[in-house]
């Protein structure tokens, strides 16, 4: 009779989990941030709040975000006027949008990843889906399984309400799935639509303005598996190690509350300082075994959480300005897309390196880090090893 240990050994893989393909998608509606303040105050019937509008414009200028993509169009808002009324009961209207559109946008990103991967969908064994909104039964994982026509035996994992650190979480979990299940190929999807957090401006709730200035919609997907078949698969990044940590006593610094008005988001002014002061502890934890302590010797896939956060992390760690260039570029072109953000940055980084002819997928460097952070205050840290091109 076969022993339990023999069964376990047969299930495990020898090599590290590897990203085999990346795909992204955005809504068609592109918003120019130079005109968005006027649009936002007009559609919410708030043009009379002139001082608040000027404050909003200054927020945009400081954010360095040039454009973003939003599912909500003026037509959709006219069809759902309660969404534009300050603190009006509107959860049902918002929910009806996101439970349909979050899986649909995720499908686009997943199809792009599957196309790049070049293998039949029947080889997908696991599905990991992450979104901040649209909690429902059946969940977005079920909806995406049906939309893509995946096998009914695909093993699904659904994660809601993680917020901005979710992109790191899905990679950490997919790493464990790939390395502990022989032949596993995990389809990972992060899809975010801000319809649930769109609120009319208010003098007493400036967090609304911060959210409108920072956030955009987008979806990203990766295929992850161990021991790639090099005849038909092209490995991009190996997931070497992963860690998650909570910054003590910071649960009130970033949080959201779901109610009949939708999801209200709160971001404390101390967040940039707290992230910058605590991120190095996470870096040391994952890079010490590799003997790496020079943070300029690695490539950076950072969460595009906002200009102030990036500025303070750069200053605290003594990073060269170019280390966060790709993260800043993604932020300027898409805004903060919550869990999908770091995967957009990873995709942009490997594309840039390919164009510039580097020997690896990122800046010619071998080692790198992916960092995401969000409610909790939670920090996810992934050590990446770039595969030679």
UniProtKB/Swiss-Prot annotation:
The keyword Membrane does not apply. The gene is CHSF. Transmembrane segments: none annotated. InterPro entries: Chalcone/stilbene_synt_C, Chalcone/stilbene_synt_N, Chalcone/stilbene_synthase_AS, Polyketide_synthase_type-III, Thiolase-like. CHSF does not appear to be pseudogene, but expression of this gene could not be detected in various floral tissues nor in seedlings after illumination with UV light. One of its GO terms (molecular function) is naringenin-chalcone synthase activity. Belongs to the thiolase-like superfamily. Chalcone/stilbene synthases family. Keywords: Acyltransferase, Flavonoid biosynthesis, Transferase. GO terms for biological process: flavonoid biosynthetic process; polyketide biosynthetic process. Pathway: Secondary metabolite biosynthesis; flavonoid biosynthesis. It comes from Petunia hybrida. Its EC number is 2.3.1.74. It is an enzyme of class 2 (transferase). The primary product of this enzyme is 4,2',4',6'-tetrahydroxychalcone (also termed naringenin-chalcone or chalcone) which can under specific conditions spontaneously isomerize into naringenin. The keyword Manganese does not apply. This is Chalcone synthase F. The active site is at 164. Signal peptide: none annotated.
């Amino acid at each position: 009779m076969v022993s339990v240990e023999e069964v376990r050994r047969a299930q495990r893989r020898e090599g590290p989990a590897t990203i085999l393909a990346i795909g992204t998608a955005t809504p068609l509606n592109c918003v120019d941030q130079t005109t968005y303040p006027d649009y936002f105050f007009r559609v919410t019937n708030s043009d009379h709040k002139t001082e608040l509008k000027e404050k909003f414009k200054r927020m945009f200028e400081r954010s360095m975000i040039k454009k973003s993509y939003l599912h909500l169009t003026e037509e959709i808002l006219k069809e759902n006027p309660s969404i534009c009324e300050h603190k009006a009961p509107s959860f049902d209207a918002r929910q009806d949008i996101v439970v349909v559109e979050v899986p649909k946008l995720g499908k686009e990103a997943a199809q792009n990843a599957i196309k790049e991967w070049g293998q039949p969908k029947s080889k997908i064994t696991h599905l990991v889906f992450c979104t901040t909104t649209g909690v429902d039964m059946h969940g977005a994982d079920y909806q995406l399984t049906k939309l893509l026509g995946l096998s009914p035996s695909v093993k699904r994992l659904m994660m809601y309400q993680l917020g901005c650190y979710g992109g790191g979480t899905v990679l950490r979990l997919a790493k464990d799935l790939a390395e502990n299940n022989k032949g596993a190929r995990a389809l990972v999807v992060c899809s975010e639509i801000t319809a649930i957090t769109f609120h009319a401006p208010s003098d007493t709730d400036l967090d609304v303005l911060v959210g409108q200035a920072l956030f955009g919609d987008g979806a990203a997907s990766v295929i992850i598996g161990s021991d790639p078949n090099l005849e038909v698969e092209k490995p991009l990044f190996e997931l070497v190690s992963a860690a998650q940590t909570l910054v003590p006593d910071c649960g009130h610094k970033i949080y959201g509350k779901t109610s009949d008005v939708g999801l209200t988001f709160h971001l404390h002014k101390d967040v940039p300082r707290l992230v910058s002061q605590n991120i190095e502890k996470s870096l040391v934890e994952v890079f010490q075994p590799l003997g790496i302590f020079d943070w300029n010797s690695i490539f950076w896939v950072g969460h595009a959480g906002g200009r102030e956060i990036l500025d303070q992390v750069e200053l605290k760690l003594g990073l060269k300005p170019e280390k966060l260039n790709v993260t800043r570029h993604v932020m300027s072109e898409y805004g903060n897309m919550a869990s999908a953000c770091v995967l957009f940055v990873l995709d942009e980084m490997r594309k840039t390196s390919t164009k510039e002819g580097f020997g690896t997928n990122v800046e010619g460097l071998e080692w790198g880090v992916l960092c995401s952070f969000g409610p909790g205050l939670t920090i996810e840290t992934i050590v990446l090893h770039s595969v030679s091109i």
